[in-house]
Amino acid sequence: MDLKQIAGEYAATFVKDGMKVGLGTGSTAYWTIQKLGQRVKEGLSIQAVPTSKETEALAQQLNIPLISLNDVQSLDLTIDGADEIDSNLQLIKGGGGALLREKIVASSSKELIIIVDESKVVTRLGTFPLPIEIIPFAWKQTESKIQSLGCQTTLRLKNNETFITDNNNMIVDCIFPNHIPTPSDLHKRLKMITGVVETGLFVNMTSKAIIGTKNGIQEL
């Protein structure tokens, strides 16, 4: 069985009857959603908030009941993947382009469980490019200010056209030559730049990590 599938399906066991659940986006969260769809079919009663249009479509296909985050005060649990995770449970997310909604849903949850395969576990964040969501207006000026923090940037494309997020924004992917020694500081500095909507750094948000390894499940 695929390591992502092992982690994703195991995470679904943390979802209990009556919970309000945030559904993540990406290839690992896909397996959690598939498993939850199966459990709903077997009688599990939950309400879910998707973190992307892609996840919304999958949940609808599996008949998982969906609600709007506007209609609830908080969620019991969100299960989502990550592009990188360190031993302090700090993350880089946004490889799939859903980082803003993912962060809104995660910050509205009492608990955030991150599911990854062992290849995503790193000593220091920053080998994977850091996604930053920016507004399209004057994006080159915003990109230039981001570059002034010492990174190389690439405007994200899809099918040779500018990638547009579910919120009609753009994404700049950033490589920092010396990785990211202090993610919380970098996040704050990036958020001070006018035009930056959100960063893919998730700091002090994760309750638990479930890692699919060749030797089985590991929890952090």
Swiss-Prot record:
Pfam families the UniProt entry points to: Rib_5-P_isom_A
EC assignment: 5.3.1.6
Leading EC class: isomerase
Pathway membership, UniProt: Carbohydrate degradation; pentose phosphate pathway; D-ribose 5-phosphate from D-ribulose 5-phosphate (non-oxidative stage): step 1/1
Keywords in alphabetical order: Isomerase
UniProt-annotated binding residues for substrate: 25-28, 80-83, 93-96, 120
Catalytic center residues: 102 (proton acceptor)
Transmembrane segments: none
Domain of life: Bacteria
GO biological process: pentose-phosphate shunt, non-oxidative branch
Alphabetized GO MF terms: ribose-5-phosphate isomerase activity
SUPFAM superfamilies: D-ribose-5-phosphate isomerase (RpiA), lid domain, NagB/RpiA/CoA transferase-like
Function field: Catalyzes the reversible conversion of ribose-5-phosphate to ribulose 5-phosphate.
Subunit structure: Homodimer.
Protein name, per record: Ribose-5-phosphate isomerase A
Native organism taxonomy: Bacteria, Bacillati, Bacillota, Bacilli, Bacillales
